[in-house]
């Protein structure tokens, strides 16, 4: 039995700030660990993680959040209908072939022209935001949070004035989880309310694009929602469109903030790399990619076993949750 202190450290501040020493320890002592802290299995060895993430026949991306919501009891479930609906479908909560279909539709919306325009817009917003920084500034609060939020917001067709509302809604939905990945009733009800407000807001954006389409004024290149609406019957359903737009903002802006924050923290500990990038800007593209690999914003992925199976000698039962650390 693994030492209780190690079990508890899976939920500590130290784990969330720097999990890699613990991962190394687990890889050598318990690479497939049953943890009561998270109510499931923790995988830390590369070969095991790779096999789980590639085996969609045995492990599913669907149902993890709804499984946790159901643990809150029957009485509260009628008040969590939007959360159940949102987390039961969509790009982040589907398996092949449904995941492949949704991904293909979304990829079609990101045309080369849109991506190139987005590249220029990111540069403009970044320069504008940096120009407002004082000599000593909070990079997370003043740059790394507002920058991706504004870009993703504009990508969806929202105005700058809407960004604070989008951030508030996204924080509530992303903040659904307690320590260990569990969900409390209080946070679930708050997230339900915020998700309702966000879906209503996105619904108005979709309705406005559809009105332009009826009048023959929609090109499909105005923003991502316009591109998705323009695909018509070959694209997403109304519910899929709402869920996709919500997911793009909720997942898109915070993961970028965390990636940039982790990257800057790593660079500040290695000033020689900053100096290299300053004198050799051609290295920056590879540097950004390496930042995502070195200390990514989401170092884990959840799966649910579809059937009884075995991972490196550990017996995993159907319906059990696994947390694969990447």
Where is each model-derived feature located?
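Cytochrome P450
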Residues: 1-325
């Amino acid at each position: 039995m693994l030492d209780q202190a190690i079990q508890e450290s899976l939920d500590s501040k130290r784990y969330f700030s720097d999990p890699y020493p613990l991962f190394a320890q687990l890889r050598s002592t318990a690479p497939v660990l049953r943890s009561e802290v998270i109510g499931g299995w923790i995988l830390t060895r590369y070969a095991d993680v790779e096999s789980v993430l590639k085996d969609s026949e045995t492990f599913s991306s669907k149902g993890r959040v709804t499984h946790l919501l159901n643990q809150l009891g029957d009485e509260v479930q009628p008040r969590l209908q939007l959360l159940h609906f949102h987390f039961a479908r969509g790009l982040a909560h589907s398996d092949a072939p449904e995941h492949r279909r949704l991904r293909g539709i979304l990829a079609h919306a990101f045309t080369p022209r849109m991506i190139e325009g987005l590249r220029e817009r990111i540069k403009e917003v970044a320069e504008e935001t940096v120009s407002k920084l004082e000599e000593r500034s909070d990079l997370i609060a003043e740059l790394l949070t507002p920058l991706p939020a504004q870009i993703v917001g504009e990508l969806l067709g929202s105005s700058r004035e809407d960004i604070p509302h989008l951030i508030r809604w996204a924080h509530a939905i992303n903040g659904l989880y307690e320590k260990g990945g569990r969900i409390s009733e209080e946070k679930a009800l708050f997230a339900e309310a915020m998700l309702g407000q966000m879906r209503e807001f996105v619904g108005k954006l979709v309705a406005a694009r559809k009105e332009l389409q009826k009048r023959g004024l929609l090109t499909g290149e105005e923003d991502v929602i316009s591109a998705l609406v323009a695909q018509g019957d070959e694209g997403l359903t109304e519910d899929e469109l709402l869920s996709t737009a919500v997911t793009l903002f909720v997942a898109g802006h915070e993961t970028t903030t965390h990636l940039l924050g982790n990257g800057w923290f790593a660079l500040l500990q290695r000033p020689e790399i900053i100096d290299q990038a300053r004198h050799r800007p051609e290295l920056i593209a590879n540097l950004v990619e390496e930042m995502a690999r070195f200390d990514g914003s989401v170092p884990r992925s959840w799966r649910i076993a579809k059937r009884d199976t075995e991972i490196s000698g550990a017996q995993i039962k159907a319906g059990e949750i696994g947390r694969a650390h990447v």
